[in-house]
UniProtKB/Swiss-Prot annotation:
The protein, known as: Succinyl-diaminopimelate desuccinylase
Cofactor(s) required for function per UniProt: Zn(2+); Co(2+)
Protein residues bound to Zn(2+) 2: 129, 164, 378
Residue numbers binding Zn(2+) 1: 96, 129, 192
UniProt family annotation: Belongs to the peptidase M20A family. DapE subfamily.
UniProt remark on cofactor binding: Binds 2 Zn(2+) or Co(2+) ions per subunit.
Catalytic residues of the enzyme: 98, 163
Keywords: Amino-acid biosynthesis, Cobalt, Diaminopimelate biosynthesis, Hydrolase, Lysine biosynthesis, Metal-binding, Zinc
InterPro entries cross-referenced by the UniProt entry: Bact_exopeptidase_dim_dom (IPR036264), DapE_proteobac (IPR005941), Peptidase_M20 (IPR002933), Peptidase_M20_dimer (IPR011650), Peptidase_M20A (IPR050072)
UniProt record, GO biological process: diaminopimelate biosynthetic process; L-arginine biosynthetic process; lysine biosynthetic process via diaminopimelate
HAMAP family, sorted: DapE (MF_01690)
The enzyme's E.C. designation: 3.5.1.18
Amino acid sequence: MSATLRLTEQLISRPSVTPLDEGCIDLLSARLGALGFVCERMDSGPDSFRVVNLWAKREGFNPLAQENRGQSATKSAANEGEAHTTPIKTLVFAGHTDVVPTGPLEQWHSHPFTPSHRNGVLYGRGAADMKTSIAAMVVAVEEFLAAHPQPGLSIAFLLTSDEEGPATDGTVVVCKQLKARGEVLDYCIVGEPTSVSHLGDMIKNGRRGTMSGKLTIKGVQGHIAYPHLARNPVHLFAPALAQLVATEWDQGNAFFPATSWQVSNMHGGTGASNVIPGELVVDFNFRFCTESTPENLQQRLQAILDQHELDYDLKWTVGGLPFLTTPGELVNAVRGAIHAETGLDTELSTTGGTSDGRFIAKVCPQVIEFGPLNATIHKINECVDVSSLDPLKNIYKGVLERLAGISGMAGASGLAAVADSTSSP
């Protein structure tokens, strides 16, 4: 059994449904601590929803700074300035140990928290999202440091048990603490399952923003046989709804599809068949690209409501802003490592839902997401091909080597022209 598979199984066997961690981070901290990582717990949240957070970092080796320690005071001061012109960069791997609920246990072919193998496939909750990614990166770092004990690259892990839930006490809390103390991050890989048909066929180099609204249209309740004595909020809202559905909010761009507006829930009435409702509650969501801002979308939507002279209350929640990492050092390193391992020229994409990348992008200039196939995430019988585990580990290790300047940069540079011209809406 490979080290990647063994660690993946150890993580799957822990029933870490949000916000529970069930010892995953203790297990990972022990592995990372043995490699020289300084592990900090940054747990957050009330006792009823306590979230386990880990920030673990191993500083890279700066040969210029090391040389300065043996120089005279005068020469050391001069060389120190030189060393500071080539700072050690930091690669962060971000992931979550929590998983979504299992759903009906009787529908699983094997227990979701008992790693099971059938026909070369590993089954278990979290197999794809995202315990395999975490295990692969930990083993990749172990192998990388065994071969290169003093790399010119700092490596960090940001792990949380609150990504699948409200995500209010997880990555966002750690990022705020890192920013407050001046921690500098250069690159981040979020281990989300991004592959579609084959490992490495797609990476996410950005995500759309998300903003939700709760709209209450006010009417006057009354008897359904006397509509002239009431004001039906459903009827009042209907013309505005049609206009909102037909509105083109923007046209997207080379990296993002156009902003979309969708109603998720609509409720009005008492349940009785002879009562005109007094109010209508509408839940809706924007998934927006970098061509729009929350403020602009709010203003435009409210202008439509006002145009129809509606009496309403509206509450907004901005869940995350869009982010985009254009082709550069990190994208090229990931593309080069994928190509070296699989022969694939990966596709850049910004499709899909939100992730913790939206928080990290505020403190790190280059953020991408890459992990195993996502076909079974959150489903009954979630699984991952065993044959993909070590290739995933090898790709992560290849990224480390490229960013540390150890190998593969010629291949990555060769892909740069492709990366610069490739985009996916």
